[in-house]
Amino acid sequence: MRHRKSGRQLNRNSSHRQAMFRNMAGSLVRHEIIKTTLPKAKELRRVVEPLITLAKTDNVANRRLAFARTRDNEIVAKLFNELGPRFASRAGGYTRILKCGFRAGDNAPMAYIELVDRAASQAEVVAAE
């Protein structure tokens, strides 16, 4: 019986799944939008949203926790210097999933996962230039 077992297996063992979501979380933080399959996007939400919540309070302990979960100093810096302050007034719901059809090879449902204030932040960068 699978009672109280949360999360998707995605046909991977636990270490592969952990490494995949660590890499995907880093890519999402770095690029602020990525394209992946719909089940992976839904599962990635459960990894990224707590990281952004952690980044809203900048202290050494939280930075170390974020590094333990991402293993990338560049990602930790962006989380705490950009994303934490950007989402300071938002109480959760930092990501958006947009369905975008089906993959050609295997007809897998595809989706974009993005950070919700991405368009506004990109517009500010263009205006600053």
Swiss-Prot record:
GO molecular function, one term: structural constituent of ribosome
Gene3D superfamilies tied to this protein: Ribosomal protein L17
CC terms in the record's Gene Ontology section: cytosolic large ribosomal subunit
Keywords of this entry: Ribonucleoprotein, Ribosomal protein
Pfam families the record matches: Ribosomal_L17
SUPFAM superfamilies linked to this entry: Prokaryotic ribosomal protein L17 (SSF64263)
Single GO BP term: translation
Similarity remark: Belongs to the bacterial ribosomal protein bL17 family.
Subunit structure: Part of the 50S ribosomal subunit. Contacts protein L32.
Protein name: Large ribosomal subunit protein bL17
Primary gene name: rplQ
